[in-house]
Amino acid sequence: MKQRALALAIKRIIWAELALSAAIAIPAFAQSQPAAADTAAGTTTESKPAAAAAAPASSTAATPATATGNGNVAQLKKFEVTGSLIRSADKVGFNQVQTVSQKDIQNSGASTVADFLRTTSANSANSWGEGQSANFAAGAAGIALRGLSEKYTLVLVDGQRVAPFAFFSNSVDSFFDLNTLPLNSIDRIEIVKAGAVSQYGSDAVAGVVNIITKHDFQGLQLDGSLGSALTGGNGDGTYKFGVLGGFGDLNSDRFNVTAAASYYKSNGFTLADRDSTRNQDFTQQPGGLSLLSPSYWNMPDGTAQPLMGCPPGSSVHPAGTNSIASAGVTGGAVCGTNTAESLSILPLTERLNAKLHADFKVNDATTAFGDFLISSNTSTSNQGVNVVGNPQTPTLVYNPQTKQLSPFNTVVPASNQYNPFGVDTPLTYTFPNAVAEETYATFWRASTGIKGSFNLPNGEWDWATSVSHSQSTVSNEYSNELNAGALNNIYQNGTYNFSNPAATPNGSVGLYTSANNLAISKLDTVDATLATPELFHLPAGDVGLGFGAQFTHQSEIMTPGGGFADGTVINPNLQTVNGQRNVAAVYYQLDIPIIRNLTFSQSGRYDHYSDVGGAFSPRFALRYQPVSALTMYTSYNRGFRAPTFVEDSNSRTLGIQVDQATGQNYTSITEGNPDLKAERTRNLDIGFQVSPTRTTDVGLEWYKIRVDNVIGQGAPSSTVVDPTTGQTLYVNIPYANLGYLDTNGFEGTLRQSLPTAVGMFTLSGDWAYVNSFKLGLPGGAPVNGAGNNYTITQPFGGSFPRWKGNTTLDWNYHKFDAALTWQFTGPYAQNLASQPSRVGSYSQFNLMMTYTGFKHWTIYGGIDNIFNRIPPYDPIFANGTLDQTGYDTSVYTYIGRFAQVGATYKF
């Protein structure tokens, strides 16, 4: 009730703002034309916006405007802003841009870029980190603005597009791995919380994240840190070291070279390292079951019978309380084995990243640049043990000739000496060795270009051109997979003692084998832009105009390797994708002052895709600043999203999904559809920012996003069943254009500084509330996924809390700084399990302290999750097959209380 009341209050604030805007605008339109700018008196002050950007071709290079010589009148300097072609001096533009500094990242306690961005309020739901179990994109992390999943958010590096991670998150979402960049190379991050298709193209529907790196650095800087979990279990020790250096002054030497490199290692941790998961027992939780891996005989009466002697490390437990067994039997008992060490919560990770940037001044108005980024990331995660005969996910064998899957025969014949019944009997059995996935991910990008400016009588024009190539290559190596032939020999010929494997030491010879798959993603880009904020002068201000053109070639290939493609192993990780496309685009932006303080902006982009055709995406925006302390803005966008290669190529993906009706898992093969149409999108944003004093900023925005022709899983084309038992083996599901997705919500920001005799106190907040996330699918009424876990049933989805927010209290006194951060995630309704009916909210407090009193040194340290909070329990994520954490891993990460200490030395 409190949340509904607050949401109602926020809506009323929005309506009040609109009324205020109208009240101020009407007399403004009625007044006479203002005097020309050159008759103004006095001196204006320089105002640098929070969203000053870097220098890509798609966001042209900025040379601050110089004085015009109009007496003593100094011109406001204009800077680049992510989301705009035209330089601006305005602190707040036509949409909300959140700027994150390196200090903000450090104060949050985050160890990596991904850790920080995934905690921002705009990343509300449906995004996945490196800890997701059974994910093709293991070790990688993305961001999903406004809950639209990762394929709707565009991530740029220095304003330029980059190749996505070679595998798809959740097997469907294309995304850029946030772990690619060295943390010490980042200058700031700009987050455009609005649709930006009219400038950036297809995948900027929910917004843009522009990661801007350090340029023109001089000197040498070393930094390092250590971290470790303190309570809640063991594991997750982290080590980080970085070096940043640069030489040359761009103004005096006419060149600068800046280089950064970093090494990061996390030891990761498993279920065995956390108090809440080490026993694999959720029977004390509402609707909870035991997650011990079972071994049992399937009796003719539908009950389970444990082996005549449980394997070493196992003990007898009721079948009805076992998550896996209870899905296939009606009673009895099983041998349960604790396999907590076999499933990782976070993988063991090593990352080595490096970046080199060079600028060369050709003349006072022209600069050439070159940039090279390379990243090598290795992650190792345990993917659990093989439970052959698992009733939740049938054991399948792939036939490379027919390209079909068939059931593995789990019936132990009467002739097998280890069958005690004398009749053919099905056996569900846990093989003890954990499947380990080792991921080798290499990313590199090379770009070069030239940018500059020239003067015409009416003003200065900025221009830029660039060309770049980026590539992601990812190899997944799997060990301890089960060889189908050797497994069949064990079941049929009695070479393996199920109760006492040590008694048959040669029984498992050839059973454990390896397999792999490979993916390569490439992107070639050519950009050119031309823009001026001073096309000509009107009584109300300057008219701005910008043009851009872009050509890209995209390609993606995924191939199952040995072990999977040849049918050697059971339950193969199959995902095949082979696609490429050319995209040509032209775009523009026109800013026109209507009256003083009221500006209209119109922009548009035409894209032509070689596989799905062309689309025009317009944007219309207004910005009104009646007084210097208040800025109001609104924008309306129409856009589109082209299908990803996994959606519109002849792809096939074997996976496990959650049944909407029962909450149970089932196996599926999702098939690409070359006949898919592009999704069509509409965005509406209305917001304001008020700064009544130099130390106060308050912002609020309401947004609405509509996506038509939503691409999702269509009706099953076929269902394959076991002819012997009638059990569903898997379901073939094609991608299709379905109904619509409609979401709306609020985002608010606050920053208040208070200078006192004992230092400067700053309170800042970043909060989001999702009012609605409706999915309108054929054949049924729309379903609102906000505030519940319905979207888990979609291929991209996770649970969707309505509320998410961060609040930080920072205290700075002389050389000392302390920041206390409260991270909040709201509750959500439990729709897919009978109990509990509600999953509770979650609060985490982090404390970071920094001291700069020693010459050249910055010493810092802190504690994350001070009170060692455990994420709220959700039985959907304690089901024995997909996840065993007991919480939604797309929303939370349970590291426990975590301490870190580090230092930076500047020469």
Predicted regions and their residues:
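Surface-exposed, low-complexity loop segments enriched in small/polar and acidic residues
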Residues: 170, 275-282, 311-349, 355, ...
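N-terminal plug
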Residues: 49-136, 144, 152, 157, ...
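Non-catalytic regulatory/gating segments with a bias toward low-complexity or hydrophobic composition
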Residues: 105, 117, 189, 209-211, ...
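C-terminal beta-signal and adjacent terminal beta-strands/loops
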Residues: 771, 824-829, 851-907
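Transmembrane beta-strands of outer-membrane beta-barrel pores
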Residues: 226-230, 247, 263-267, 374-378, ...
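Gram-negative outer-membrane beta-barrel transporters
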Residues: 599, 703-832
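Outer-membrane beta-barrel translocator/receptor signature
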Residues: 172-176, 184-187, 198-209, 215-277, ...
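Short loop/turn motifs that connect adjacent beta-strands in outer-membrane beta-barrel proteins
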Residues: 216-219, 250-255, 362-366, 453-463, ...
